Amino acid sequence: MYSGAGPVLVPPTTTPPLPMPAYTFKPPPRPDFGTSGRTIKLQANVFEMDIPKIEIYHYDIDIKPEKCPRRVNREIVEHMVQHFKAQIFGDRKPVFDGRKNLYTAMPLPIARDKQVELEVTLPGEGKDRIFKVAIKWMACVSLQALHDALSGRLPNVPFETVQALDVVMRHLPSMRYTPVGRSFFTASEGCANPLGGGREVWFGFHQSVRPSLWKMMLNIDVSATAFYKAQPVIEFMCEVLDFKSIEEQQKPLTDSQRVKFTKEIKGLKVEITHCGQMKRKYRVCNVTRRPASHQTFPLQQESGQTVECTVAQYFKDRHKLVLRYPHLPCLQVGQEQKHTYLPLEVCNIVAGQRCIKKLTDNQTSTMIRATARSAPDRQEEISKLMRSASFNTDPFVREFGIMVKDDMTDVTGRVLQPPSILYGGRSKAIATPVQGVWDMRNKQFHTGIEIKVWAIACFAPQRQCTEVHLKTFTEQLRKISRDAGMPIQGQPCFCKYAQGADSVEPMFRHLKNTYTGLQLVVVILPGKTPVYAEVKRVGDTVLGMATQCVQMKNVQRTTPQTLSNLCLKINVKLGGVNNILLPQGRPPVFQQPVIFLGADVTHPPAGDGKKPSIAAVVGSMDAHPNRYCATVRVQQHRQEIIQDLSAMVRELLIQFYKSTRFKPTRIIFYRDGVSEGQFQQVLHHELLAIREACIKLEKDYQPGITFIVVQKRHHTRLFCTDRNERVGKSGNIPAGTTVDTKITHPSEFDFYLCSHAGIQGTSRPSHYHVLWDDNRFSSDELQILTYQLCHTYVRCTRSVSIPAPAYYAHLVAFRARYHLVDKEHDSAEGSHTSGQSNGRDQQALAKAVQVHQDTLRTMYFA
């Protein structure tokens, strides 16, 4: 064993050669199936598909004019199939993906080298619309090849076959419901689920076709998302601006009200109500500064002369409509340069528009309450969904000879043994997790830090957070910290009240200059405030000071639990070690120096086209592994590949060497946030980048790399078959449940692991897919290692849903978002959404996320 310093007892094995050029990068085959742990009977929300061994015929569809929404394209193709039934389609039931791809079970009478051009008329509101559709043969898609791949006779699952089956299974639901990604939604009949702010919850289902061992599977899950409520724009505005009714708004909107309203309605579709049956639709591009009574536009008169006319006057003259709310602004619709204005009162929000903007905190918690289902309830809902979807009577599914089993798939899983957790102090107590949780009572940190110089800065109002509150809080914190083995010696050297984000930097500078050896500043916040972002910006990036924020409510009323959680974070930020995995129980990979890397890229919220994406990579710095260092970069908007990975990994390897005096012989890389479609691209770029980082350090330095993608955003759920196995109020699967058969990839190395105890709703197991493995892990070794790493997250005494390095990478990227916040922009929404980084050049952004030298080697993100 190596302990972070001292000799390596086990000689390193010979390291594998560099991989061949990029085109040969291929995920490794599954080495074996795991056997560790006790078996557990489960059901998974995937349904076996019976696929015939036929050929499917693939045609390319080209619709002119282009760029119609998928819904319109589907209508065009449906009309085309009906209209040209006699000449071309006969009794065939083609399926269409809404873009370019059409599939049939029998070939169409179209020569392979010819293109057929048809004219299709869609009846429209007001006038008919005419489209030109060109059809040409593309390929035969062999379902036999799919069978061969699933049974292992062919190396790769043919992507085009899976895609064709997906289109077949989605064709009818796409016509019945509102498709969003791989899910389908419909407005809840009879029972609205309002979220506030003009938004509501729509329920639906996720559906996707997935290859697994021997069989194709249909993955079905319940799904929910936020849509905009179909309602008059006036009512929408009242919800957004928190007016009880429009009657209380007799004055024009203030600037801040108008800005807030514009932010919400911009980009939405509205339909007009003042032209009888012709409910023409427009997209909102802006909200006018001036009210309808004053907003003018150039009106061309019959004489050919152009005059400036107000919107209110125009509606009175042209539509005989006297506006009820001429003091309110207008919507500017269509193209901005065309000056088309509509009064709010003649517009409705069009139904079926999904909300892609970020939900507020209140909306998010309402959404969670509305959608959380215990595991047995979710299982029942999915079974109901399957019955109502009735795939086996779907005429399009039957056309292709596909059958789907009605029952969920039975799977045998295994519950892995949790690791033992070692504490410090005199007792060197050992904790054994039960259902993913353990207790720190009567235990002391493995390495506790003694705090001698510390300060309190209270940004909560003195009348709410009194000096008595602060005194009690200080006493209680000192007591709990002493019990935990992190003694806080004496009273704070400084304890003062302050107000607003602007006072953070001057106060912190004063503290740093006045109190030598200051270790920690505890900052008390009055709820959600821009002060938090500024504290972290100044502490992490400007002055290099350790800060711990505490909400005012936790100071007014202290509990041992919250104080204990605070101590977990403080000890780690100051360089302590809370606990470690019991060395005797760790997997064999620890016998040589090994570095664990976690990587994640976070993107700005949908609908934001300017803010950069943030890439974070963390690396373990000891043998436990407990301490981590972070690197972070800003990169191109929505860029998933980590652009500067080579330099980031190089930094971490140098830091590892400085901390341990060892060069890692193995690199275990947990990569979060990559979807299946990006596997090849990410593997190619990032594996080479890691290799490059090693070679740049030393020409012959070639540690073995294992590259694992961690996925949380999937729809596979596991349920206990035996009621007695269910855990907790939500009836979930036990922590440690692992599955690597039947519902996993037919040939590649992947597995599901639910490492945490589900508290609310249905547990989501994490999916791990090994894209590269020089270290030749067995299934048991990698599954046990991954599960143990889920127990090393420092913020709590429970196992978490993904390995600690991947979790830390997420925290680092999230913290960098705060570092980018401009302190002068306050925001009611909460600090991390306020006036960020727009228009700042790349260099300034890179500098903004650069952590201070004194903070660099600490776990400031904990």
UniProtKB/Swiss-Prot annotation:
* EC identifiers of the protein: 3.1.26.n2
Q: Which PROSITE patterns match?
A: PAZ, PIWI
Q: Which residues bind a divalent metal cation?
A: 600, 672, 810
Q: Where is the PAZ domain?
A: 232-351
Q: Which UniProt keywords apply?
A: Cytoplasm, Endonuclease, Hydrolase, Magnesium, Manganese, Metal-binding, Nuclease, Ribonucleoprotein, RNA-binding, RNA-mediated gene silencing, Translation regulation
Q: Where in the cell is the protein located?
A: Cytoplasm, P-body
Chief localisation class = cytoplasm
> What GO terms in the biological process aspect are recorded for it?
miRNA-mediated gene silencing by inhibition of translation; miRNA-mediated gene silencing by mRNA destabilization; negative regulation of translational initiation; positive regulation of nuclear-transcribed mRNA catabolic process, deadenylation-dependent decay; positive regulation of nuclear-transcribed mRNA poly(A) tail shortening; pre-miRNA processing; regulation of DNA-templated transcription; regulatory ncRNA-mediated gene silencing
Q: Can you list the GO cellular component terms from the UniProt entry?
A: cytoplasm; cytoplasmic ribonucleoprotein granule; nucleus; P-body; RISC complex; RISC-loading complex
This one is known as Protein argonaute-2
SMART domains listed in its UniProt record: DUF1785, PAZ, Piwi
| Taxonomic lineage from the root | Eukaryota, Metazoa, Chordata, Craniata, Vertebrata
Residue span, Piwi domain: 520-821
Q: Which family does the record assign?
A: Belongs to the argonaute family. Ago subfamily.
Q: Which cofactor does it need?
A: Mg(2+); Mn(2+)
Q: Name one GO molecular function term.
A: single-stranded RNA binding
Instruction: Locate the region Disordered.
Output: 825-847
> Into which EC class is this enzyme placed?
hydrolase
Q: Where is the composition biased (Polar residues)?
A: 830-841
Alphabetical list of SUPFAM superfamilies matching this protein = PAZ domain, Ribonuclease H-like
Q: What does this protein do?
A: Required for RNA-mediated gene silencing (RNAi) by the RNA-induced silencing complex (RISC). The 'minimal RISC' appears to include ago2 bound to a short guide RNA such as a microRNA (miRNA) or short interfering RNA (siRNA). These guide RNAs direct RISC to complementary mRNAs that are targets for RISC-mediated gene silencing. The precise mechanism of gene silencing depends on the degree of complementarity between the miRNA or siRNA and its target. Binding of RISC to a perfectly complementary mRNA generally results in silencing due to endonucleolytic cleavage of the mRNA specifically by ago2.
Quick one: where's region Interaction with GW182 family members? 590-593, 653-663
Annotated region (Interaction with guide RNA), positions in chain: 314-319, 527-569, 712-713, 756-764, 793-815
- Give the originating organism: Xenopus laevis (African clawed frog)
Note what the entry says on domains: The Piwi domain may perform RNA cleavage by a mechanism similar to that of RNase H. However, while RNase H utilizes a triad of Asp-Asp-Glu (DDE) for metal ion coordination, this protein appears to utilize a triad of Asp-Asp-His (DDH).
Tell me what gene encodes this. Answer: ago2
Origin, by domain of life?
Eukaryota
